[in-house]
């Protein structure tokens, strides 16, 4: 006896639906998703000209806290990304934002495993992105970020 096919209620009008919401990221980061980067009950955010932080939101969907990563590798395991806002402003080495993609810094986003979180390193300097409990953002720390993928 064969069980019923679980998706038989799908039709062309609802076959491409996605569920709105968020989910904590696990494993390797992939490009093309809206992401939030959070630590210490704060989230990386942007004000149009620089990277900053603000209080984490319950649904992880505040527009100024959403980012998209763009893979810059050659081989599948290359961990090289540009980080941009959803308005295509790129994070630079000075943690400012630029419309010029060529000024974007390259970052490595490494899953530390076992739910610890992700380390985010700027590749030229080797310094890790830091989000302090006071909300300040800098390079040169040891913050582990929880990353959430968000569907609006």
What would you call each of these model-derived segments?
Residues 2-152:
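Lectin-like carbohydrate-binding module/patch detector with strong preference for beta-trefoil
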